[in-house]
Amino acid sequence: GGIFKTANKEHLSIDEIKCEVKNSYFLTGSFVKGDGQGHAEPSEINLEIRSTEEKSKIAELINKYSEKSPVLNALRTPLKNTFSLTANGRRKKLNNLNESKKNDAEDPYQFYTKQPSPNEKENFSDRMILKTGKVSEGTIEPVDGYNVSASSGNVPGNENFNKIIRTIVGNSTTKANDKIVEVDTVLGLPGMSHFIISMDIDGIKAPSPVNVMGAAISFCFLTQTHRYIQHQKFQIEGLRMSQYATFEKNSLSPLTMLPLDTHLFVNGTASDEDNERLIDMSERTCYLHATLTKCLIPKINFEIIN
């Protein structure tokens, strides 16, 4: 969507773009032992562009959009993300994490006076996220859950250590007049379910790509917190979160992302130490937080189809 929009401004003709995106992640350590560490590799973006324009012009176009894309800039910018913890209505001091300076983060329990529901007055896409029913060929196979190298300090190593990479694959085909980009996304393993995620570059009929990125980070982080609460038997309930992704732009530099600001709200009888430990472990195993802490230059490949 962004490339089409930029092409229109540059008076360049593009009929169709097929896009494949591969995001690869791996885990070292053990989720069970609580020493897991998520890692990310640079995204691979493969474009097949149907156009009669010269290849050099398309290359320049892609480079221009890459420089101003909020999502791609987030991948290129290493961030020291910030956090806050509010337990039973009281803000707690964090000892081992970067403390957020924001003092007015919204508690979802107070922000939403009633359960959120779709806006019936607006013509939104009914395919924002959809399980398609398609399943990748093959049979689901279990993996080794303890992935520690023999050189991991005092932690016993796994003699059969290997970097088990999980790749998320997204494919889309977008034509010049399309208002919404639909991405078929799947975990690149046998037997996995396919989903459709829809985006509107203007954020009108569906979330914008930046909105989708924010939702993905939130979902990934909260998934880890719920897993750890259950596995570690933390006395924590009523988990909710507010997250702020801020971008900075000025005339002297391209768009840059500022540290992701995450605010966790909990109830329960868990100690302050357990509450902070929950955030710490969840951040370390969240693949998307791992993505944001590194400078990961996307690999963009393209070919022109006449």
Locate predicted features:
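Extended beta-strand/beta-hairpin segments
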Residues: 5-215, 225-306
